[in-house]
Amino acid sequence: MSLFTIADLHLPGAEGKEKSMEVFGQRWADSQNRLERSWRAIVEPDDDVVIPGDITWAMNLDEARRDFAFIDSLPGKKYIGKGNHDFWWATASKMNVFFAANGFGSLNILYNNAYIAGGAVICGARGWFFDEESQKTVGNVSWDKINNREAMRLEMSLNAAV
């Protein structure tokens, strides 16, 4: 059994509302198919894969259904964390109900909790910048509020790990 981590999948979202990563350059051409080929060549069914964020451009769970079905179809048990572009993110209980209702049995939410995977503990929180110069934002952002909230979530996740 192996443990892998991959972030920033940026899958396209719901049919008819897709956002192509090719707008960021030709290197993103056919990215989902290339991801699938590489994943299937490397990841075994009993492996664990952490996907710590920026999973899909979808704006809500229903729009993300196709992308989650794709991820669920890939080998391995997946642990999904929240990234700064995961606007679809809901409460953990809503996401767990959604995953169960759609038969996404290999997907697990990593949020204020921890998992044991072989000889490793998987835990964490969304990363954030400590200063305004490092992150461009739209509108007023309370940096202290964001950093304090994510620090509390990280502490809860670490406490769940011990």
Residue ranges of predicted features:
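Core catalytic region of metal-dependent phosphoesterases/phosphodiesterases
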Residues: 2, 15-117
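Conserved catalytic scaffold of divalent metal-dependent phosphoesterases
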Residues: 9-14, 90-162
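Short, hydrophobic/glycine-enriched beta-strand segments
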Residues: 2-9
